[in-house]
Amino acid sequence: MSRVCQVTGKRPTVGNNRSHARNATRRRFLPNLQTHRFWVESESRFVKLRLSAKGMRIIDKKGIDSVLTDIRARGEKI
């Protein structure tokens, strides 16, 4: 399973670790992904999504039905 938020599309980014001597070694910054189950009243079922903390906030603001419509419009199967 890829480390990509299904709502925002956030994915790992790359950067540097920095030691006290300012030596740079490459590293990955991973998104804060959570697997969360949402009850969808219109479909009378639970939907399991893998999303970031920001994705959860978007669902709180817009509603699960609106977000699912956007995800399906992108062609993702839920």
Swiss-Prot record:
<comment type="similarity">
    <text>Belongs to the bacterial ribosomal protein bL28 family.</text>
</comment>
<dbReference type="GO" id="GO:1990904">
    <property type="term" value="C:ribonucleoprotein complex"/>
</dbReference>
<dbReference type="InterPro" id="IPR026569">
    <property type="entry name" value="Ribosomal_bL28"/>
</dbReference>
<dbReference type="Pfam" id="PF00830">
    <property type="entry name" value="Ribosomal_L28"/>
</dbReference>
<keyword id="KW-0687">Ribonucleoprotein</keyword>
<feature type="region of interest" description="Disordered">
    <location>
        <begin position="1"/>
        <end position="25"/>
    </location>
</feature>
<protein>
    <recommendedName>
        <fullName>Large ribosomal subunit protein bL28</fullName>
    </recommendedName>
</protein>
<dbReference type="GO" id="GO:0005840">
    <property type="term" value="C:ribosome"/>
</dbReference>
<dbReference type="InterPro" id="IPR034704">
    <property type="entry name" value="Ribosomal_bL28/bL31-like_sf"/>
</dbReference>
<dbReference type="InterPro" id="IPR001383">
    <property type="entry name" value="Ribosomal_bL28_bact-type"/>
</dbReference>
<dbReference type="GO" id="GO:0003735">
    <property type="term" value="F:structural constituent of ribosome"/>
</dbReference>
<dbReference type="InterPro" id="IPR037147">
    <property type="entry name" value="Ribosomal_bL28_sf"/>
</dbReference>
<dbReference type="GO" id="GO:0006412">
    <property type="term" value="P:translation"/>
</dbReference>
<keyword id="KW-0689">Ribosomal protein</keyword>
